Amino acid sequence: MKLVLIRHGESAWNLENRFTGWKDVDLSPKGMEEAKSAGKILKEMNLVFDVAYTSYLKRAIKTLNIVLEEMDELYIPVYKSWRLNERHYGALQGLNKAETAKKYGDEQVHIWRRSFDVAPPSIDKNSEYYPKSDRRYADLADSDIPLGESLKDTIARVLPYWHSDISKSLQEEKNVIVAAHGNSLRALIKYLLNISNEDILNLNLVTGKPMVFEIDKDLKVLSSPELF
């Protein structure tokens, strides 16, 4: 079976160099073109998907829709989960990355962004970016609502959905596409390829580029793209 992972196309806040996290930012015009290009590439590879998964965030949802439209596969089932959302950047969400580095120092911002288990400062529950005020997360328990996540935290959030849903589709011998985010996809890739905590920090995923894995029904990875 084929498992295709794709990071959403460039978003408006990627373009503005801002921490995005769970903020529901749209694709930029370039991001839409990246998604179209990805769909054409996958169509040229003669890939046919049986099921798709994505997050609750429109930049990933729209990327998936554009890809499937280019492939003439908009009819397949699509499942959305908050567990595939981007890493929550806490109080940093909405801030310009360069300005944040000037305020806190390059070293501190680098630690927040690139360490495995250090989370950024927690978001204030009165902030406009606090997820619980968004109705799509209204049914989540307070304990499931992140105030800020490290990559380790993101992995702990993502993997239960892999085990409960995505992997089951592969075991049913279905071809699967997952459109999500840089850190939620790093979580899946780390697990699939057994990448160390140190090495995963060096994995940078390009926006809008499909990554094709071949996986057997026992969930063994038979082939994977060159990632580093």
From Swiss-Prot:
This protein's pathway? Carbohydrate degradation; glycolysis; pyruvate from D-glyceraldehyde 3-phosphate: step 3/5
Which PROSITE patterns does the annotation name? Answer: PG_MUTASE (PS00175)
What keywords would UniProt list here?
Gluconeogenesis, Glycolysis, Isomerase
Name this protein carries in UniProt:
2,3-bisphosphoglycerate-dependent phosphoglycerate mutase
Q: Name one GO molecular function term.
A: phosphoglycerate mutase activity
Could you tell me which Gene3D superfamilies the record lists for this protein?
Phosphoglycerate mutase-like
The UniProt entry, under PANTHER family, shows: PHOSPHOGLYCERATE MUTASE (PTHR11931)
- Give any Pfam family that matches: His_Phos_1
Against InterPro entries, the record matches this protein to: His_Pase_superF_clade-1, His_PPase_superfam, PG/BPGM_mutase_AS, Phosphogly_mut1
For the site labelled Transition state stabilizer, the residues are: 181
Say what the protein does. Answer: Catalyzes the interconversion of 2-phosphoglycerate and 3-phosphoglycerate.
Biological process (GO) annotations held by this record are: gluconeogenesis; glycolytic process
Q: What class of enzyme is it?
A: isomerase
Q: Per UniProt, where does substrate bind? A: 7-14, 20-21, 59, 86-89, 97, 113-114, 182-183
- Source organism (scientific name): Fusobacterium nucleatum subsp. nucleatum (strain ATCC 25586 / DSM 15643 / BCRC 10681 / CIP 101130 / JCM 8532 / KCTC 2640 / LMG 13131 / VPI 4355)
Catalytic reactions on record: (2R)-2-phosphoglycerate = (2R)-3-phosphoglycerate
Give the E.C. number(s): 5.4.2.11
The entry sums up its family as follows: Belongs to the phosphoglycerate mutase family. BPG-dependent PGAM subfamily.
Q: Which residues form the active site?
A: 8 (tele-phosphohistidine intermediate), 86 (proton donor/acceptor)
